[in-house]
C-alpha cells in the first residue's frame, strides 16, 4: 500500500529527520507538545532531504501563491544521507537555490556552532527566515507561531 500525503492545511510543518518514524525518536515529545499547543498544525514527516524537496516541489504553486503556509524544521545530521553531517545545511541551500527562500526554516540541532559553520561553508544566505537553535523552547515557539 502506498501513502499519499495532502499538505493542504493552513499551517504545515515539514519535519525532516532520519529518525522521525522511530517509536523512540528523541523529539517525539516535542512534536506532541507543539501539536497540543496548536491543533491546527499538520506535521508532515520526511526522513531525507530528497523526500522533503520532492514533497515541497509538488506544492510549489500553493506555497508561492501564499494559499498554504509551510515551515520546515530539520536536524543537521542524517545518517541515511551522504555526507551525513551537513544534511540540514544542504537542505537549506537546496531550498534557497530552488525558489523556496521565503519559507521559514529552523535547524534544531545539538551544536549551533557546527550548524552555523556548515551553513557558512555552503554559502547559505542567512536571512531572517533561517533559525538555528539547540533550545527546545525555541523549537516549540517556531512550530506553533503563525
Regions found by a protein language model. Name each.
Residues 16-17, 46-49, 72:
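Conserved sequence signature across two-component system core domains
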Residues 22-28, 56, 82-86, 116-120:
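A short acidic (Asp/Glu
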Amino acid at each position: 500500500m502506498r501513502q499519499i500525503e495532502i499538505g493542504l492545511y493552513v499551517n504545515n510543518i515539514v519535519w525532516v529527520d532520519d529518525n522521525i518514524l522511530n517509536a523512540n525518536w528523541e523529539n517525539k515529545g516535542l512534536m506532541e507538545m507543539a501539536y497540543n499547543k496548536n491543533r491546527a498544525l499538520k506535521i508532515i514527516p520526511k526522513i531525507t532531504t530528497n523526500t522533503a524537496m520532492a514533497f515541497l516541489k509538488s506544492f510549489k504553486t500553493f506555497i508561492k501563491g501564499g494559499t498554504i503556509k509551510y515551515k520546515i524544521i530539520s536536524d543537521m545530521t542524517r545518517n541515511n544521507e551522504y555526507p551525513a553531517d551537513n544534511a540540514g545545511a544542504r537542505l537549506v541551500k537546496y531550498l534557497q537555490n530552488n525558489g523556496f527562500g521565503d519559507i521559514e526554516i529552523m535547524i534544531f540541532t545539538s551544536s549551533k556552532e557546527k550548524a552555523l559553520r556548515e551553513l557558512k561553508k555552503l554559502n547559505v544566505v542567512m536571512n531572517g527566515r533561517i533559525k538555528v537553535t539547540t533550545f527546545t523552547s525555541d523549537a516549540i515557539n517556531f512550530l506553533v507561531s503563525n
